[in-house]
């Protein structure tokens, strides 16, 4: 099965061995609790509209991708709020890149297979990590 990311009319094929690391950890329910003045537990719960994290990552030295594709992904990541269609093995999501609250959290991470000094678009990188957030209806 394939993994693709589409921006407008441009579709990029992503490495098929990417693993959706946080697929089963997200909850569609937001909940908060507090105590009333008589000690009664008050629970507020509601359905979330978007915001699901989608982290696709390679395992070890897998998830090879060429530098040219990485450059395209990097250009897309530099467009704030850019909505894209992510197809993960037949499931389609509208996503934006997740830049995270910290400088250490990057939307795209990878390692060079061989670190050439004169990099070419055909050079390969591995251990790819792509961080997305599923866009809400109102984003």
Model segments located where?
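Extracellular/virion structural assembly segments
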Residues: 1-139
């Amino acid at each position: 099965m394939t993994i693709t990311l589409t921006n407008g009319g441009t579709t990029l094929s992503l490495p098929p061995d990417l693993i959706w690391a946080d697929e089963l950890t997200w909850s569609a329910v937001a909940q908060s609790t507090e105590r009333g003045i008589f000690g009664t537990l008050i629970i507020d719960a509601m359905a979330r509209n978007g915001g699901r994290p989608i982290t696709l990552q390679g395992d070890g030295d897998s998830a090879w991708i060429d530098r040219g594709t990485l450059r395209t992904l990097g250009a897309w990541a530099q467009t704030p709020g850019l909505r894209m269609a992510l197809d993960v093995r037949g499931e389609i999501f509208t996503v934006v890149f997740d830049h995270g609250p910290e400088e250490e959290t990057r939307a795209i991470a990878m390692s060079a297979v061989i670190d050439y000094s004169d990099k070419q678009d055909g050079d390969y990188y591995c251990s790819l990590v792509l961080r997305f957030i599923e866009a809400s209806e109102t984003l």
